[in-house]
Amino acid sequence: MKRRAFLAAAAAGAALPLARPAIGGTAKTLVFVPQANLTSLDPVWTTATVTRNFSLMVYETLYGRDQAFNPKPLMVQGHTIDDDGKRWTMKLREGLVFHDGTPVLARDCVASLQRWLKRDAVSVTINARVDAIETPDDKTLVWRLKKPFPLLAHFLSKVQPQPVIVPERLAATDPFKQLTEIVGCGPFRFLPDELVSGHHAAFAKFDKYVSRQEPASYMSGGHKVLLDRVEWRIIPDGATATNALVSGEVDWLELPSPDVIPVLKKASGVNTGLLDIYGTVAILRPNSSIAPTNNVMLRKAMMAAVDPREAMIAAMGEDESGWHAPMGYFLPGVAAANDAGMAFRTKPWSVDE
């Protein structure tokens, strides 16, 4: 492959799911260096980012979030809401097939969601509102609610932990134990015989994958599979990974260290860019349960004393295209972003405050 790229994560944004690779031209195989070793293959069992990214290759969810973080139908055709908001009826799309050749059925979805709810904190909210999830036929899920719950689709489009759909026989696995067989209905099949922990993982195009017809928008819409094969090379050493990219041994470096980015920008044949516009959040979190940082006045003083721009320069370098500071509680660029609580950056607190 002639085209090589890397993903530089912004240091001031939440860790959100990455867009699936879509390399055009005649490329058939993509060699990708993930940010960490792939130690777990179960996105319900762990919230590790590398496992989440792995799951985007092989699994799908009933709903996916678009670029504005709105839930959109993914595995389902859509839903209807009646009984004064207390009954949601969801219909699965036609043609959905698992990697083992079996059709995706409503009971697979219910079993998968029940396993997910035993691990995700949102279960407290959902279970308090759900009377039952029924499957009147193989393609239909009916949620009977105790009271209206407009955020149901939003919760089902979560990206971490992901409510991925697996066959009922696998969904019966104890949620506190990892899945040992990887079978989804996503665009790529995982190739377990090629897994070498700490070194290599591989995926093959799933020929029976049925993409949606809408334009892709982040985790929603139609994701076209333009590759026959994807290989993950685990290269923990940053310098080694950089050399592999420059020499053409690999095609995509997900998370290069900031100090090598200037080198990559000058390297022949290497394309650099910021694909994850939200990135990861850098946080200084004092322990508020013990002295002296259980004193809110001290924590406010610490907050005022730390200049986030200086911190980001120290961590990421002076090129501000790769980070954002200061930031409020929500991610820069999202609808909820605001400056609440940030006034002290422009107007210092008084002693009384």
Name each model-derived stretch.
Residues 77-122, 136, 142-144, 241-244, ...:
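Aromatic- and charge-enriched surface segment that lines or borders ligand/interaction sites
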Residues 93, 211-263:
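Ligand-site clamp/hinge motif
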Residues 127-128, 262-274:
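Ligand-binding "clamshell"
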Residues 5-23:
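N-terminal export signals
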Residues 33-83, 114, 183:
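N-terminal lobe/hinge region of extracytoplasmic solute-binding protein
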Residues 66, 204-207, 277-301, 305, ...:
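A bilobed periplasmic-binding-protein/Venus flytrap-type ligand-binding module shared by bacterial periplasmic
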Residues 322-353:
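Structural transition elements
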Residues 91, 125-196:
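Surface-exposed binding/hinge segments that line
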